[in-house]
UniProtKB/Swiss-Prot annotation:
Sulfotyrosine sites (modified residues): 4
Positions of post-translational Phenylalanine amide modification: 11
GO terms (BP aspect): defense response; regulation of blood pressure
Native organism: Ranoidea citropa (Australian Blue Mountains tree frog)
Biological function: Hypotensive neuropeptide.
Residues with PTM Pyrrolidone carboxylic acid: 1
Tissue/organ expression: Expressed by the skin dorsal glands.
PTM per Swiss-Prot/TrEMBL: Isoform 4.2Y4 differs from isoform 4.2 in not being sulfated.
Presence of keyword Secreted: yes
Compartment(s): Secreted
Designated name of the protein: Caerulein-4.2/4.2Y4
Length: 11
């Protein structure tokens, strides 16, 4: 599990 909080990730 990865936490992409505060960054821009397009899924």
């Amino acid at each position: 599990q990865q936490d992409y909080t505060g960054s821009h990730f397009d899924f």
